[in-house]
Amino acid sequence: MQNYFEFFNLPEQFAIDLQGLDQAYKKIQRLVHPDRFVTATEAEKRTAMQWAAMANDAYRTLGDPVRRSAYLCELNGYHVRKETHVSMDPEFLMQQLEWRELLQEARETGNRPMLEKLAEQQLHVRQKQMEVVENSLNRRQYENAAQEIRKMMF
């Protein structure tokens, strides 16, 4: 079975041509559209539906940078969502707790400037995390990338 990159004829790497992904997706969807299988056998309809479902899943996965990163790690034997990965950096956990407390306080008091500041901080942290993930994937350091992705999913 093909992986999602092969399915869309894209290089197996983090940086992909999103326009190329979109075009490949639309081409496959046109080929397996139900209107084309009105007079087909049940087996042909089922196969077309399976192709459409795979195209949808592959498109959602590759179109999202975090999902794409996790998928690349998993293709290379590093499972991001495994329950066995329960330990996190204590500093990271403390930062998460602090942010959640500040967020709760800002919501309860209606402190809009604080909410905006927290959102800005979170965006900055997420951008830095994505840079770490991309650099790790480019260097084929899948364990580092997987660890950072877990933080992003926390």
Which residue ranges define each predicted feature?
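C-terminal accessory/regulatory regions appended to core domains
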Residues: M1-F154
